[in-house]
């Protein structure tokens, strides 16, 4: 089953890019900013587990 989640957006509506795939401290910080406890770097963009609201940019 697919785990729900999404790519959070910054205040300019862009995804957060990342260089280190998989576990990524920067992505963890980004996801926590968006109220989600866990995330990682996938396809060079931060992806947050169980993050559903892509309109809540920070």
Swiss-Prot record:
Cysteines engaged in disulfide bonds, as pairs: 18-41, 27-46, 31-48
Subcellular location field: Secreted
Membrane-crossing residue ranges in chain numbering: none
Molecular functions per Gene Ontology: sodium channel inhibitor activity; toxin activity
Broad class of the protein's primary localization: secreted
Residues annotated as domain LCN-type CS-alpha/beta: 3-58
Top-level taxon of the source organism: Eukaryota
Record bears the keyword Disulfide bond: yes
Signal peptide start and end residues: none
The entry's keywords: Disulfide bond, Ion channel impairing toxin, Neurotoxin, Secreted, Toxin, Voltage-gated sodium channel impairing toxin
CDD domains membership: neurotoxins_LC_scorpion (cd23106)
Gene Ontology CC: extracellular region
Pfam families xrefs: Toxin_3
Tissue/organ expression: Expressed by the venom gland.
Key word Lyase present: no
Domain comment (free text): Has the structural arrangement of an alpha-helix connected to antiparallel beta-sheets by disulfide bonds (CS-alpha/beta).
Function per UniProt: Binds to sodium channels (Nav) and affects the channel activation process. In mice, causes hyperactivity that persists until death.
Family: Belongs to the long (3 C-C) scorpion toxin superfamily. Sodium channel inhibitor family. Beta subfamily.
Name of the featured protein: Dortoxin
